């Protein structure tokens, strides 16, 4: 059994926005509201970044076309007592998926925690787990 930090990537679509900044704000608010409804205040929400295939520079994953915005969001949470990396991923997707229904979640990064200095605010294996 191990403890993991799992980072999921989610594409969020927002409507009636005119700028990238407005799209980012609307997407973050949409995600935060959904997470708060499910009492998932331990999930950290961050703006995603994409890498330019030509120069390698990173830029914000937010695009606006025709007043529709697509924003990449990273969702980070700790998963405790998971049996494996894959188990931790399934738990994270199940927990976040309850709040973000119909939003595809992709694993961005997963790290095993080795030191006990991390704070205990996350989800424990078996707690709130559904079929993912």
Curated annotation (Swiss-Prot):
Pfam family, one: DUF555
Protein family: Belongs to the UPF0212 family.
PANTHER family for the chain: UPF0212 PROTEIN MJ0068, UPF0212 PROTEIN TK1194
Protein name: UPF0212 protein PYRAB08340
Species in which this protein is naturally found: Pyrococcus abyssi (strain GE5 / Orsay)
